A protein has these predicted regions:
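Short cysteine clusters
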Residues: 15-22
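C-terminal scaffold of the Radical SAM
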Residues: 5, 13, 26-52, 56-268
Length: 268
């Protein structure tokens, strides 16, 4: 029997501290007990739907919605093991996750490796000035060299992605340019350029000028724009987002996640 190809998303709409320039709907604050209960509820949801989706084959898995790494590493490992035991998952299905840089550490990496996470999208937002420290209660900027050249580079895989903001008032044109250049100088395989939201947002013309300059710099460095504002080294394009853009059905679990299946869209 031919299986129906789908992509899967686990939605974690949580963030430790929401920055003013973030337009996404997120739950602010770190509550370990709450997050664990959320994972247990998601596990029940996955189990309950498995039989009805037995004719589907998962081509890619995305852990997103917020900073997915705010979830305990062992809980994420539990969810991914459950998915592989209850669902048909393609052997080469990538697993990508949106992460706060501070969570790429010795406590979590063993669980991420066991979960076969293939790429970590680090929420940096800006490298000049460094902005990701606003995502947590501590300033983790001193860990940056350790993060990028330690665990991830030692992986010897194309496993590091960056998330950068464009169109932000407090980041000058030259600061944004420097941030993009840093992407080209580090072992980064994927880049998402996210539009700044809220009061910190530049007007459309200035924001577009930053995008145009980024496009030139990234193209010169060998990156390819495979979807709007998503850049990758050749062969490192994101299968999840490609599937979504090409109309592939989406199995989604978690708060505010939307599923697209057989022409119907439902939201949790």
């Amino acid at each position: 029997t031919t299986l129906h190809p789908v992509v899967m998303k686990l939605n974690f709409p949580f963030i430790t501290r929401k920055p003013s320039f973030c337009g996404r709907t997120l739950i602010e604050g770190h509550n370990t007990e709450l997050l664990h209960r959320y994972v247990l509820a998601m596990a029940l949801e996955l189990k309950a739907n498995a039989a009805d989706l037995a004719d589907c084959e998962v081509q890619a898995i995305r852990l997103g919605g917020g900073s997915a790494s705010i979830i305990n590493g062992s809980d994420l490992d539990h969810l991914l093991r459950l998915i592989r035991s209850c669902y048909h998952v393609a052997e080469d299905a990538p697993v990508t996750m949106r992460t706060c840089p501070a969570d790429i550490n010795g406590a979590n990496m063993p669980f991420y490796n066991r979960s076969h996470v293939t790429r970590y999208d680090l929420e940096l937002y800006s490298l000049e000035p460094l902005d990701f420290c606003t995502l947590d209660t501590l300033n983790y900027s001193e860990q940056m060299p350790y993060i990028t050249h330690g665990f991830l580079r030692a992986d010897r895989r194309d496993s590091m992605g960056f998330v950068l903001l464009y169109g932000k008032k407090t980041v000058s044109r030259w600061g944004f340019r420097h941030s993009v250049l840093e992407v080209t100088r580090r072992p980064v395989c994927h880049l998402l350029l996210q539009r700044c939201a809220g009061a910190d947002m530049l007007d459309d013309a200035e924001a577009q000028a930053q995008l145009d300059e980024a496009a030139q710099l990234l193209t010169e460095a060998g990156f390819v724009q495979y979807l709007p504002r998503r850049w990758a080294k050749p062969g490192c394009e994101d299968k999840f987002w490609q599937g979504v853009a090409n109309g592939m059905d989406v199995l989604a679990f978690g708060l505010s996640a939307y599923t697209r299946l057989d022409g119907m869209i439902t939201t949790n």
